[in-house]
Amino acid sequence: MSYTIAAEIRTEIGKGSSRRLRHANKVPAVIYGAGKEPISIKFDHKDIINIQENADFYSSDLTITVDGKDVKVRVQAMQRHAFKGLIEHIDFKFA
């Protein structure tokens, strides 16, 4: 099964801006690898929380739409809050 997720480019990077995103129910993320420049992005938490419950989310290629362009990626790592179950950050790798 393939998933398509809409994302926005992040202009502010760092701990403070990531915290502000999380308080606004956004998930900070980064796409990196394959000799390309890393792309810092953000998602709506509700968009990602439901699809990440499927095992296919972690093992198959995903499509992330960033500024109208489709980018094929795989989940590399995901950080969660210790007891709330919220997603705090996702690392994607170019597929």
Curated annotation (Swiss-Prot):
Q: Which Pfam families match?
A: Ribosomal_L25p
**What family does the entry list?**
Belongs to the bacterial ribosomal protein bL25 family.
The Gene Ontology biological process terms listed for this entry are: translation
- Primary role: This is one of the proteins that binds to the 5S RNA in the ribosome where it forms part of the central protuberance.
Record-linked NCBIfam families? PRK05943.1 (NF004612)
What keywords appear on the UniProt entry? Ribonucleoprotein, Ribosomal protein, RNA-binding, rRNA-binding
The record describes its quaternary structure and partners as: Part of the 50S ribosomal subunit; part of the 5S rRNA/L5/L18/L25 subcomplex. Contacts the 5S rRNA. Binds to the 5S rRNA independently of L5 and L18.
Q: InterPro entries in the record, alphabetically?
A: Rbsml_bL25/Gln-tRNA_synth_N, Ribosomal_bL25/Gln-tRNA_synth, Ribosomal_bL25_short, Ribosomal_L25_dom, Ribosomal_uL5_bac-type
Q: What is this protein called?
A: Large ribosomal subunit protein bL25
Q: Name one GO cellular component term.
A: cytosolic large ribosomal subunit
Gene3D superfamilies assigned to the protein according to its UniProt record, in alphabetical order: Ribosomal Protein L25, Chain P
